[in-house]
Amino acid sequence: MPREKGRKVVASNRKARHDYSILDTYEAGMALTGTEVKSLRAGRASLVDAFAQERNGELYLHGMHIPEYVQGTWTNHEPRRTRKLLLNRTEIDRLIGKTRESGLTLVPLQVYFSDGWAKVEIGVAKGKKAYDKRQDLAKRDAQREMARAAGRRSKGMDD
């Protein structure tokens, strides 16, 4: 069976972009079982409350939920098991160094298939304060209102 080309997004973590300031992003592979891959191909995954953490010089993804494969048998996987992230040693060392800085964490932003391989986009993130979140919401509302007004003006519906 030929490998599909392109990028097919399975799950996005929109809440992470709201709760954190993303400083840098990395693409990592994941060590998965067969039923996990089949469940991901069916578009079933959740990144809510997921995070990456260092253990014994390796990075692991915790809290990602991949539901059991519907047609799976006794070989089905544990939905919230810890999954190893596959990165180059230099990338792992760089990410571990960044997480040891105060206030920085690793959060998954997207899970997708890239040329047939399951990948996760990891973001180096710093937690936002409540007032930062409010500022972002106010800024987004202002931009939306300006776009709406510009659309009305271009259609000749200006009051």
From Swiss-Prot:
GO terms for cellular component: cytosol. Gene3D superfamilies: 2.40.280.10. GO terms for biological process: trans-translation. It is found in: Cytoplasm. The keyword Transmembrane helix does not apply. Required for rescue of stalled ribosomes mediated by trans-translation. Binds to transfer-messenger RNA (tmRNA), required for stable association of tmRNA with ribosomes. tmRNA and SmpB together mimic tRNA shape, replacing the anticodon stem-loop with SmpB. tmRNA is encoded by the ssrA gene; the 2 termini fold to resemble tRNA(Ala) and it encodes a 'tag peptide', a short internal open reading frame. During trans-translation Ala-aminoacylated tmRNA acts like a tRNA, entering the A-site of stalled ribosomes, displacing the stalled mRNA. This is SsrA-binding protein. The gene is smpB.
